[in-house]
Each structure stands twice: as C-alpha cells, then as structure tokens.
Amino acid sequence: MSLEGKRVAVLAEDNYQDLELWYPLLRMREAGAQVKVIGTGSAETYTSKYGYPVTVDAAADEVKAADLDAVIIPGGYAPDRLRRYPAILKLVREVFEQGKVVAAICHAGWVPISAGILKGKKATCFFAIKDDVINAGATYLDQEVVQDGNLITSRTPDDLPAFCRTIIAALEGYNIDPTGFQNLSGL
C-alpha cells in the first residue's frame, strides 16, 4: 500500500470532529501521501469540537484542483462553515469534475451538497443529514462506506477504518468506476 506521489487535501474549519480529521490525515501520511490541511482562509489555526487545534497549510483559494489527487472532508460542525465559502465549494467541485477522489464523512455531506455534486449519486452520511442528502438528489444507503465512482462517503467515526481503506484503494487505482457504484467495505 503506497500512496507515494499522491497529493491529498484535508479540509478544516472550527468545530471539526477530531477523529474524522486526524485519523484520515495520519492514515494518508502513513500510506505515503503528501497531505496538506486546507482551510477557508478565515484563520491559520482551527479548533476541533473537543479543543484540539490544527494549523492549515493553505487557504482554499490558494490551491488548484489540478494539484490534488483527493479531497477529504471531515465532519463535526465544520462542514456547516466550510459550505459558506465559495473557494471551498469550487475546489471540491473541480476535484470531483476532474475525476479525482472526493471523500466526505458524517456531516461533511453538506459540502458536496452545496458544491452540487451529489445529484444522481449513491451516498451515506450521519443520519441527521440523511434528508439533506436525499433532497440533493442522491440515493441514501445506510452502510459504513459507499463509493460511487470518485465519490466516497461514510457515516460516523466508527466507520473510519473502512472509510480510509476505501480512500487508499481508490488512490491506488482500484475499483474506480466513474459510471457505477462500488462498495469496498470488505477491504
């Protein structure tokens, strides 16, 4: 398992869910990816729901989708802030349109909704935003991880191992089918 040469952005804003930011960030680094924390530009450091800080490497308006292989969006309450910034939505939309991985867990489904990329897709999320996902035109599946082409979604921190395995497999080029649904939860 090697992600050497892969460039991954992890989005951050205040009130991010601690595990949903740090677990994927560290797993991607462990697998060899170059990982950068990308913020909205409103601050240089953001604080998690439980008080843990993360320092950003750049603001979204300083990053080009062409320079990334994936964007990971942690949950918590940060997605409600992230979705308010046009530069964040543009980055997520462009990464998705370029056929690269967009991965969202828990409440992070709000960002792909606001970026307009969920319509016609299969997805999962934290149960509290299930109606939002459905109203955005997605088919909701209650599974630990759902991969539909280059879109990967997951529900809660309990699902982080499957979420990260699926992201890594997608970045390694396995089971990417932009026209169909893939469930890699068994990896």
State what each model feature region is.
Residues 120:
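Exposed beta-strand and adjacent loop surfaces of beta-rich binding modules
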Residues 1-98, 102, 111-117, 130-187:
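Extended, subdomain-level signal for the structured scaffold at the beginning of enzyme domains
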Residues 123:
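Anionic-ligand binding patches
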Residues 106:
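Catalytic nucleophile serine of serine hydrolases
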Residues 127:
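Active-site glycine-rich loop that binds ribose-phosphate moieties when present
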